[in-house]
């Protein structure tokens, strides 16, 4: 990919803060992501081996709640960093922005934590469909505070385009989570409580690293511009984050709707329903690793697209987003092929044969996770156009579709019905987001359409997906239908550049 966002393009006063180009960002992130994802995969296997389905289901519900409550409790303030850190940095007001948002996030987080401590029975019923998990709710409140802090630094460093630091924080988080999780499960209690504590501890450790880095470079942040009035700053931030907050709320509800339907609306007891969620969790272990790659790459892309957008290079934004979606979608489908081929070994040996229900729904879990990752990337265009509120339309329709189809299919097909409902809802959301971006000037090309259709084949088995992927490779190499000549040139130039860099190291 082209390197349009170099440090030299930034104001001179911002030079002490190192930024990474988009091409460098992708390479760095992918390199460190390999290690991080390997650690995460091994950790997930151990959790599935040691925890029974009901305990695994409890952890799944807690994690879903943390992902929902984190941005919800702070009104998604940190989501504005990707859009406005560059804006205030160029106006030499960045320290003001960070101070005010940090104080606001801390106050909102304290209020949320107090609510969890004061109403443990209510939250236990909400999360687990039973009022007797108050001890676990207390641990959740502590972990939530750490999650909010961790999200603050990840969003900030992403906005500063310091991908090395983001990848490092993610790696630290993964390593500490694995070490604490294994240690607590073996040395304290083989239950969901240990995993919740471990995750909170990992977020705390990563946040401390973020605090250390920011404190050492605080004086390099520009602040000699006139401070913006509180009304001006909060109006700008909240007009953007309000819709991002609603979008985040809907996206997280969208993600956990099927599991909440299983827990709250199935005819099974709370323990049996949580066990079904545990089976579902086992089918999502690897697919979620794949989709996390897409969402991380998508969040990394936002400030670069925003940079091009601010400079008026709208055509470049369209071309970059199309190419990004094609490459990411293809790699996710390759990952799905590998997962399907290795599924018997994964579920039979690594998971000790405990999750037959998870194996049965794995193909459709892979399918909807890929579509989820792709619409997460596509909505970057809405964010750049400051039309994040339009994304809520697609998410709301998708959420209602998910709930409606779950009501219809869950009683008849059980866990498979819940997964099919989620797959259909993700496809509909993807189509709606692409339609909305088209109204704002985004033009999806033929190659992107082909890649987005490939996940349908996953349910036919590994051989079918292999044939389709090989056909795509041949078409991309021999024609300009999937990759244009300019895109091939760009990829070859980037490959040649990195090849020279690698050779220079030897």
Residue ranges and their predicted role:
Residues 2-13, 461-506:
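Membrane-proximal transmembrane or re-entrant/amphipathic helices at the cytosolic face
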Residues 74-89, 159, 283-325, 379-384:
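Helix-loop junctions and terminal segments of transmembrane helices
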């Amino acid at each position: 990919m082209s390197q349009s966002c170099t440090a030299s393009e930034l104001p001179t006063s911002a030079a002490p803060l190192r930024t990474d180009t988009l091409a460098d960002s992708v390479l760095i992130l992918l390199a460190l992501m390999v290690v991080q994802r390997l650690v995460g995969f091994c950790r997930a296997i151990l959790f599935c081996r040691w925890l029974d389905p009901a305990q695994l289901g409890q952890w799944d519900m807690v994690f879903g709640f943390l992902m929902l409550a984190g941005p919800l409790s702070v009104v998604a303030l940190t989501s504005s960093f990707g859009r406005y850190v560059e804006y205030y940095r160029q106006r030499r007001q960045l320290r003001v922005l960070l101070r005010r948002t940090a104080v606001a996030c801390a106050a909102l987080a304290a209020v949320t934590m107090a609510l969890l401590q004061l109403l443990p029975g209510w939250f236990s019923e909400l999360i687990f469909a039973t009022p007797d998990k108050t001890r676990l709710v207390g641990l959740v409140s502590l972990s939530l505070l750490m999650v909010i802090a961790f999200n603050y630094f990840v969003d900030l460093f992403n906005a500063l385009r310091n991908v090395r630091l983001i990848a490092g924080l993610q790696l630290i988080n993964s390593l500490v989570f694995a070490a604490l999780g294994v240690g607590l499960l073996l040395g304290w209690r083989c239950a969901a409580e240990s995993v919740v504590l471990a995750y909170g501890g990992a977020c705390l450790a990563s946040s401390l690293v973020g605090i250390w880095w920011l404190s050492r470079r605080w004086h390099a942040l520009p602040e000699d511009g006139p401070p913006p009035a509180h009304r001006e700053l909060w109006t700008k931030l909240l007009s953007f984050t309000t819709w991002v907050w609603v979008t985040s709320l809907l996206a997280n509800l969208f993600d956990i709707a099927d599991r909440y339907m299983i827990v709250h609306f199935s005819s099974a007891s709370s323990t049996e329903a949580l066990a079904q969620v545990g089976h579902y969790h086992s089918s999502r272990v690897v697919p979620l690793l794949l989709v996390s790659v897409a969402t991380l790459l998508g969040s990394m892309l936002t400030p670069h697209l925003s940079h091009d957008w601010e400079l008026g290079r709208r055509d470049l934004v369209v071309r970059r987003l199309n190419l990004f979606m094609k490459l990411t979608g293809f790699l996710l489908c390759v990952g799905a092929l590998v997962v399907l081929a290795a599924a018997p070994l994964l579920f039979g040996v690594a998971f000790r044969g405990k999750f037959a229900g998870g194996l049965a729904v794995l193909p459709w879990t892979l399918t909807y996770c890929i579509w989820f990752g792709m619409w997460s990337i596509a909505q970057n265009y809405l964010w750049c156009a400051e039309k994040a509120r339009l994304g809520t339309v697609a998410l709301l329709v998708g959420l209602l579709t998910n709930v409606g189809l779950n009501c219809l299919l869950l009683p008849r097909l059980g866990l498979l019905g819940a997964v099919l409902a989620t797959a259909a809802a993700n496809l509909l959301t993807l189509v709606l987001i692409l339609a909305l971006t088209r109204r704002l000037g985004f033009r999806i090309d033929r190659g992107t359409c082909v890649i987005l259709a490939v996940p349908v084949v996953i349910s036919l088995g590994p051989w079918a997906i292999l044939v389709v992927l090989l056909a795509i490779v041949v078409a991309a190499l021999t024609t300009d239908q999937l990759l244009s000549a300019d895109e091939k040139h760009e990829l070859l130039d980037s490959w040649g550049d990195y090849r020279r860099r690698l050779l220079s190291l030897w």
